[in-house]
């Protein structure tokens, strides 16, 4: 993947297209968490891809490509939300959440007991499979803060499930 990123940085359009295709599912899921509207998601993805293409030469370290790409997307999503002047609630999950004990509807209700920030961290960690380090970069938080919030969210969810 590093070689592909380097090729894209050097102007290889096909390499760039392959990079975007490799990350399309993560891009869509992240945009869905923020926007939950297909038209807004399409706009955010289009703007993100264009911005990434125009600025990929500025990427300092290839190992941070995905984090950099996701940061661009999150900023685009926030811009769209500001333009529409509505709050981003994260109570819907991406399809494909599987749990033997809880169905999707129950998961949605369960996560509502968390504050927005903790809910976002839990979703990025468990459903989008981001690492704590990636989440800290995406949300511009210290990784220890992300770990603490994740731990507290787990504890709160366990407590609610036991009731």
What are these regions (language model features)?
Residues 1-25, 107-108, 112, 138-139, ...:
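N-terminal module of bacterial RNA polymerase sigma factors
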Residues 9, 36, 47-64, 84-85:
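Sigma70-family region 2
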Residues 24, 28, 49, 115, ...:
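C-terminal flanking helix
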Residues 29, 43-50, 54, 63-75:
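Structural recognition of an alpha-helix C-terminal capping motif at a helix-to-coil junction
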Residues 57-60, 71-90, 152:
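Arg/Lys-rich amphipathic alpha helix in sigma70-family domain 2
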Residues 74, 78, 127, 133-163:
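DNA-recognition helix of helix-turn-helix
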Residues 79, 83-112, 131:
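Internal acidic/polar
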Residues 121-125:
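A short pre-motif secondary-structure segment
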């Amino acid at each position: 993947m590093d070689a592909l990123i380097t090729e894209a940085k050097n102007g290889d359009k096909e390499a760039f297209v392959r990079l975007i295709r490799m990350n399309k599912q993560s891009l869509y899921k992240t945009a869905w968490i923020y926007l939950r509207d297909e038209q807004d998601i399409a706009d955010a993805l289009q703007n993100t891809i264009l911005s990434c293409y125009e600025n990929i030469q500025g990427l300092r370290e290839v190992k941070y490509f995905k984090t950099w790409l996701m940061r661009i997307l999150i900023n685009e999503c926030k811009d769209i939300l500001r333009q529409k002047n509505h709050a981003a609630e994260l109570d819907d999950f991406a399809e494909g959440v599987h749990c033997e004990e809880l169905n999707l509807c129950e998961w949605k209700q369960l996560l509502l007991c968390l504050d927005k920030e903790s809910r976002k961290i839990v979703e990025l960690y468990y459903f989008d499979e981001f690492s704590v380090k990636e989440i800290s970069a995406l949300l511009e938080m210290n990784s220890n803060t992300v770990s603490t919030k994740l731990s507290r969210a787990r504890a709160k969810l366990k407590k609610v499930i036991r009731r």
